[in-house]
Amino acid sequence: MYFAVIGTHVRGKSASPAMHNASFKALGVNAVYIAVDVPREELPCFLKLARLNLRGFNVTIPHKEEVVKHLDGVAADARAIGAVNTVLVERNLLVGYNTDASAVYQLAGSHMRGADVLIVGAGGAARAALFAAIKAEARAVYIANRTYERAEALAREFAEKFKREVKAVRSPVKADVVVNATPVYDAMVADLSGASLYVDFAYIPTPRTKMVEEAQRLGIKVVDGVDLLVEQGAQAEKIWLGVEPDRTVMKRAVLEFLGI
C-alpha cells in the first residue's frame, strides 16, 4: 500500500513520512508513505493518479480548501469546515475527511468550552480550529488575519452556517485560548497574557516557536505543532487502516526527524 502527503515544498521538510512509516512498521503493515510536491495547477492531475496508485493521502498548504471540489465524497464535518486534510482512496473513489479539526477538538476542546477563543489565520487550519471551537461551545470566537477581508469572509461564512456569532477582528484580541493556525514560527502573532491554553499548528523548522516559548515562559499550557501533527496523523491512520496506532511511536519519529 502507498500513502502520501501533498502540498508545496513538503519533500524533505514534512515530518509526516517519518511519522507514518515508523507507525506502519510498528503495526506490521506493509506500506510506504512519501511526500509529493504538487503545485496548484497540477492538483487535478495528481488526483487522477492517486485514484489508481494510493490507498490514502494527507493534504497540506495550499490544497486543503481547493481539493474539496475534486473529491467523490466528503465527510459531513469536513464539508461544513470547507477543508480536507485526509483522503481515503477506496475502489478508485476519493473520500475526504478533516482530522485537523478532530485533533484540535481532542487536544483543546475541553479548554475551549465556555471560553473566549482567538484564531489567527484564515486558511484550512483556521477553518478546522474554528469548527473545533464551535463544536466545543466556546463562549466567543474571534478570527484575526493579516488580510482582514479574509477573516471577515470566514467569520461571516461560519456564522451563517452554524447560526452563531463569529467575530473578525483587525488585530488579535486577548482570549482564554489562542490558536496560531498559520505557518509563522518566528514572530509574536498575539498577546498571550491571561490565556490558559496556546495551540500552535507550526512545527517546521521547530515546534519551539516564538509563541510557544512565550507561552511556556508565562506558564500557559501548550499544544504544539508536533502534538497536532501526531493526533491528526493517528486519526488518519485509523481511517485508512481501521486500527489505532501508537502515538508514542509516531511522536518519537517526528522528534527524531526534527533533531530534537
UniProtKB/Swiss-Prot annotation:
Superkingdom, natural source: Archaea
Entry keyword set: Amino-acid biosynthesis, Aromatic amino acid biosynthesis, NADP, Oxidoreductase
Reaction catalyzed: shikimate + NADP(+) = 3-dehydroshikimate + NADPH + H(+)
InterPro entries: Aminoacid_DH-like_N_sf, NAD(P)-bd_dom_sf, SDH_C, Shikimate_DH, Shikimate_DH-bd_N, Shikimate_DH_fam, Shikm_DH/Glu-tRNA_Rdtase
Pathway: Metabolic intermediate biosynthesis; chorismate biosynthesis; chorismate from D-erythrose 4-phosphate and phosphoenolpyruvate: step 4/7
Residues at which NADP(+) binds: G121, A122, G123, G124, A125, N145, R146, T147, Y148, E149, R150, F201, G225
Gene Ontology biological process terms from the UniProt entry: amino acid biosynthetic process; aromatic amino acid family biosynthetic process; chorismate biosynthetic process; shikimate metabolic process
Biological function: Involved in the biosynthesis of the chorismate, which leads to the biosynthesis of aromatic amino acids. Catalyzes the reversible NADPH linked reduction of 3-dehydroshikimate (DHSA) to yield shikimate (SA).
Subunit structure: Homodimer.
Stated name of the protein: Shikimate dehydrogenase (NADP(+))
Organism in which the protein naturally occurs: Pyrobaculum neutrophilum (strain DSM 2338 / JCM 9278 / NBRC 100436 / V24Sta) (Thermoproteus neutrophilus)
Gene label: aroE
